[in-house]
Amino acid sequence: MARSLAALLLLLVAAAGDSHAASPAEMYWKIALPTSPMPGAIRDLINPASSAGSASKEDTVGNVFFLEKDLFPGSKLTLHFTRATAGAALLPRGRADSVPLATEKLPEILSQLSVPAGSPAADAMSARPRRSPARRSNARRRSSPWWSSPRPASAPATCTPCPRRSTGQGRRRGRRTGWRP
């Protein structure tokens, strides 16, 4: 009885010791880089059975990506998508609406946003174009050949697509399509 118990114990120890044997890749790592330990990510790639106990359902890489050998007609794969967390906005809506957006009120803006005057952030904020948004868009229109000719009063407020664009031919290079009365 004692002999069979000892043999069984020896068999269990041999089986447990065999599962922790170093793979050829681990042996090569020890020979090539004897002073540096193998990173866990590489060890998990080499021996995925050792990392099976530590895998969790939250592991999105393992749940979304799969191996090519698993892709064949009729195979069923389970994908777990975690719910995306809503990121925090820069400022709450009420506070963002209360910030005055005028260059003459720059000191008030800096104080509301807790930006010290003279800091690089304050300098960047004061270096913005000093024109109003309406003046900027008008300047953009005047410099663009698209807006170079004024629209006649009889023209509709919205553009109608050219027949060439509606047939799917699209815009040719070097030729702009515009509004038509």
Curated annotation (Swiss-Prot):
Write out the biased-composition intervals (Low complexity). 144-157
Q: Where does the source fall among the domains of life?
A: Eukaryota
**Signal peptide region:** 1-21
Organs and tissues of expression: Expressed in roots, stems, leaves and shoot.
Instruction: Provide this UniProt record's keywords sorted from A to Z.
Output: Signal
Q: Where is the sequence biased in composition, kind Basic residues?
A: 128-143, 170-181
Task: Report the gene name.
Answer: BURP7
- Entry's transmembrane regions: none
Q: Which organism is it from?
A: Oryza sativa subsp. japonica (Rice)
Identify this protein by name. BURP domain-containing protein 7
Disordered: region residues? 112-181
The residue ranges of the BURP domain are 65-181
The answer to whether keyword Cell membrane applies is: no
